[in-house]
Structure formats: C-alpha cells, structure tokens
Amino acid sequence: MVLSIQTNKNVGSITQIIGPVIDAAFAPGQLPNIYNALVIKGTNQAGQEVAVTCEVQQLLGDHCVRAVAMNATDGLMRGMNIVDTGKPLTVPVGKVTLGRIFNVLGEPVDGLEAVDSKESLPIHRKAPAFVDLDTKLAIFETGIKVVDLLAPYRRGGKIGLFGGAGVGKTVLIMELINNIAKAHGGVSVFGGVGERTREGNDLYMEMKESGVIQEKNMSASKVALVYGQMNEPPGARMRVGLTALTMAEYFRDINKQDVLLFIDNIFRFVQAGSEVSALLGRMPSAVGYQPTLATEMGGLQERITSTKDGSITSIQAVYVPADDLTDPAPATTFAHLDATTVLSRGLASKGIYPAVDPLDSTSTMLQPWIVGEEHYSCAQNVKETLQRYKELQDIIAILGLDELSEEDRKVVARARKIERFLSQPFFVAEVFTGSPGKYVSLKETIQGFNKILTGELDDLPEQAFYLVGTLDEAVAKAATL
C-alpha cells in the first residue's frame, strides 16, 4: 500500500485484540473515518518488528473504533500505538502492475523489485453514475467457438464460471486473457480470493510458460495478479476483490481499455464477509451469512460495468457449497450474472477441450434482437441436435446405432461432428498439444455450424472436426485422413 501518513499524525492506542479484530482509542474529536486505513508499527515482547495494517469498520463510542486487520495480528499488545493514515487503503495502478503479483495492500509479493508507481487509488470508490454508463448491449467476442455461439459474453457483463477440479478452468482463463489482449488490445486483472496458495503459484508459472506474463519485458505482459489466499486473515480475503477491481478500473477509466477481471472465487468473498461480520458481532442472517450479504455483493458488482470510456467484463468462478444452488451465497451471485459457462467432466474425459457444456451454459445475450436471427437460429439448432443425441444415447448403448431410424442416424452423425467442432486448439496450450492456437471469428463459427446442420458435410469423417479452428481446416484435415 502507498502509505503517506498525514503530517499531523493522529495516534491512538490499542485497547483490545480479539483475533483479527482490533479496538483502538483516539483523542476526543480525532476519530478516524469508517474505511480509513490504520497502521501499527512497533516491537513485540520478543523484540521482533511487527507491522499491521487494518481498516476501520465501526465507531463504537467513547472515542473508540473497531478495525479489521489485513495481516496476522501475532505479537500485537494492548497499549501499542496505532496511526490513522487519514485515507482508505490505497493501491498502485497502471502499466507498472502488469506481470506482477500483489497482496491486498498493493505490495508486490513476487520477490521482484518494488513497484515504482506514480499513480495510486483508494480501493473504496463509488460505482460509475448512470449517465456515464454505456447501456448499449454488445457481444464481447472471445474467439472461442463454443462460448461465442452458444453462451455469448456481454461487453461489460458478468459471467459465472462453474467447474470442478481438473476440467480446464485455468487454461480457459488463460486463453481468454490471451485473446482479449490480441483481439481487443485489452488487459486483464486476476483476483485470487481465498483460494489455495498452490493454485495461485501454478497459475503464475503457467502464465509465464504460455507468454501471458513476459519476465524479460514486464510491460508486454497481459495481466496483473492480486492474491489474498486461504491462509490470509478474513479482512484481507474480503478486500482483495476490491484491490483487483480498483486496478481494473484504472485501465478502463484512464487508459480507456477493455479489461477482463477474473475473480476466483466469488464465494470466498462472501465467506470472508461472513467471518468478518461474526467477528464484529453482527446478528447472522439465513444459513449464518452476514445480514449485509446483498449490499456487499452489490457494492462489488455495481463497479464492474461498461462506461463510455471502456469496459470491465468480469468472469467469476463460483463455488456452490454442497451443490446447493439455493444457498444464499451462490443465489445472491446469480442475480448479477449475464451468462454462465459450465465446464463438464464428461466432455473433458472424452478429450474435448474447452470442455464447455453446450446445453448447460446459458446467456441472456442469446436473443434474436441482440445477436441477430442467423446467430440465434444457428445456436438453437445446434442445441436441438445435441439434445436429441443426448436422448438417443440410452438406446444406442443398449441396442446399437443400427436400430435407429435413418433420420435419427443422421442426427447422431451430425451431433458427433458438432461436439468435435466445438473443440478448438488454444494458443496457451500450444506448448502441451503441439497444435497452433486458433482465434475463430463469430461469422466463421456460424457459417461452419450451419454447413454441418444442413448436411453439406455428411460425407466427411467426424475426426476431421476435432481440434480445428474454422471449417476450411476441417475440410483440409479430412483430405489427409
């Protein structure tokens, strides 16, 4: 965090410490504002240096405030000095953040040199006013066939990413980061909220390997990473999403770019808020969640939007506790989503990547008056064919293909081609697959699927459609088989 403490220091003293919650007393008339950052620097009884930053959450009366710590409170004692910085937590923003890993305070944690940032912004900011919003509905083309055709993303929208372990979430995220940089000249910000440290490290290593982060030329990197992992105090996990969002807002508002904001995992943001709420002594609401759940979620989500300057499109991994979609945490998240991308283990086990489930994934953008009649009818026909194939699978398993009618056999053959054509080679997976990545425009995607549906390509083998970009590549591949 960029800490320029005001010259006339407002110093209080710690009166109580309960885990990550700190109470502090200040002189009459000198109480810090809600959300102000407080800093404790001193030496503990073992003679070790301690430095803790916290954020004011409540004004208790009797010249006391209650704050939540952003770091571990080990070694703090009653009576220690606590300094009001006079402003909220402030983090570095701009091009210098690209290729780097930050914590909730905006401090680099990747072991590289300090960030020399001339620009910094507070993490608590108002959402853009309605007059500044770009309310035009526009598709955000990703270059990934299955997404653009069946569950298109909205520019400045929010997308939920559902999928268990090992079905290709990370690779899909990295491909989106790569494609937004190439096709839209945009950048990405990744907020790791309350997930495993190992996963954060793996993502960083894979990004370096695939060229999304370029160590030799950091400014050519396409992403900034902000981590507040599982082992961090709840205060840090609750605020790390806002730190990532603040960095993304700068790219949108000042650099006027299209930004992709990844939040992994939005459920952990709610979970951290619930822990903080209990620590602050608030009465719990349904299922033990915080009473302010909808307000906290709204405060974060309303800042993620398109303005006349640029857009922030957010992709949020959603963990569903005990697979219960009615749980207040996922239910509150769903209210904000424009599209869902569901990854399927069944498709992944068949080797079809990206393993996006074409029937489970949805989008509010898939309406004829938004995407146009041609796109809409093509998407509906693809879904219809795949659904019919799904219904016939039991019959095929028991009696075999020969027992189907001529019409149904055609449907099955086309559905299998569609299923394979929905796969495509990724740029970021080139190092693993050996196949060069492909960015497929929406126009080419629609043309390709229309030709499969009309039966023009019934004589081509289904293997020709596997892991190719456009239809021309499938035809060329068929000639070599």
From Swiss-Prot:
Gene3D superfamilies: 2.40.10.170, Bovine Mitochondrial F1-atpase, Atp Synthase Beta Chain, Chain D, domain 3, P-loop containing nucleotide triphosphate hydrolases. It catalyses: ATP + H2O + 4 H(+)(in) = ADP + phosphate + 5 H(+)(out). One of its GO terms (cellular component) is mitochondrion. Keywords: ATP synthesis, ATP-binding, CF(1), Chloroplast, Hydrogen ion transport, Ion transport, Membrane, Nucleotide-binding, Plastid, Thylakoid, Translocase, Transport. Its EC number is 7.1.2.2. One of its GO terms (molecular function) is ATP hydrolysis activity. Produces ATP from ADP in the presence of a proton gradient across the membrane. The catalytic sites are hosted primarily by the beta subunits. This is ATP synthase subunit beta, chloroplastic. It comes from Tupiella akineta.
